[in-house]
Amino acid sequence: HPDEKVRDNAVERHKRWVDAAVKLGCHSIRVNTNGTVIKDLWLTAAEDGLGKLSTYAASKNINILVENHGGFSSDPEKLMHVINTLNMTNCGTLPDFGNWCIKWDKKTKKCVVEYKDYYKGIEIMMPAAKAVSAKSYNFDKNGNETKIDYVKMLQIVKDSGYNGYIGIEYEGEEIGEKEGVIATRNLLLNAAKRLN
């Protein structure tokens, strides 16, 4: 948030998440970097807020991960500028295969500015990844995601040297949530068999 008091309040609230993560035995928490649509303000605010929270989390051996989750966080060059500027070993990314909307229309709630190359975006974010989210929306008759080439995505993940967890998120409406998660899991397993 561009207002430092509001931002500091958010950091304080998120410290409870860090403490909970310690008790639960987690390695990371995922955060958003919302608050402003003005690029320079966002960069400054994101660096400040993430830096403060990551400093606290480092004392607890917890990672702070930013997901591409709308706004400037869905512009991987800008997000990685923040991550690289902070240069903190416990401040990284959680690349999501499907969250690339940079700007929404307030009235229609539709995306009006989207980062176009999902694959390049994932590749840019992977060097700082400490978790990955396999997003899916809909599947064709062969079980492939209709918008995202999972073999291509997983090859990028593999080529980055990543060997951690890949979470699953199904956001489609054609099948139920449980069925969507299972279909995404099956797609991941099948895609993994086709990697170089």
Each model region followed by its residue ranges:
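Acidic/histidine-rich catalytic cores of soluble enzymes
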Residues: E47-Q155
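Helix C-cap/helix->beta junction micro-motif
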Residues: L24, S59-K60, T89, S160-Y162
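Flexible, glycine- and charge-enriched loops at secondary-structure boundaries
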Residues: D3, R7, V11, K39-L43, ...
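Structural motif corresponding to the early beta-alpha repeats
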Residues: H1-D48, A58-N63, N99, W104-K106, ...
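Active-site clefts of carbohydrate-active enzymes
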Residues: A129-N142, N163-E177
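A structural motif
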Residues: A21, C26, A129, Y162-N163
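C-terminal helical cap(s) of enzyme catalytic domains, especially alpha/beta-barrels
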Residues: E177-N196
